[in-house]
Amino acid sequence: MSITVARLLRHMAWANQETIKHLQTLPEESLKAYATNPEWFVAEIAHHIVDSADHYAYEITGNVAITQPGDPCIADIESISDLARLAKQAGIVDAQLIGAADLDDVWLDLKNDGGKIQRLRSTVLSQAIHHATEHRTHIASALEAKGFEPIFLDDISLWDYEIYETANGLRD
């Protein structure tokens, strides 16, 4: 068996779902919790993880996961009940990112605020993983800063994912 980025992407997808499940157990006001910047509150961060993954998926594959380029982003998270929709959207975009691990590692022509750039597909896929990890940590910090039960990051580590995938017959 070869070591692949697909397993890291599967971990990312699982950890995203576990984070959303945890948020669904918290009171409504937890969605407005923030660590240091009130513009980056829990609901905004969770939305940002999935919305960014939607954009990464399109950039990597050229296929639309949820939103067309130029269309409005996915809907904001206003209440705990909106997290069920976010979980479905995360499942869609994360599945597309996992599938992209089988594509050739080619240079992609992309645009950002600074203009046109080129990045290897593997770089964008790796950044998608890093981005989600970084912001799940941000969510945990925001919850803890405002006195809500944070997700215990060790519970969504690769160590715990390996236990989960082994118990569920998901190993390659």
PLM feature segments, named:
Residues 1, 5-8, 83:
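Residue-level preference for long, well-ordered alpha-helices that form the structural scaffold
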Residues 91-126:
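A mid-sequence interfacial segment
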Residues 6-21, 25-72, 112-172:
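Short, contiguous alpha-helical
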Residues 63-104:
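Helix-adjacent hinge/juxtasegments
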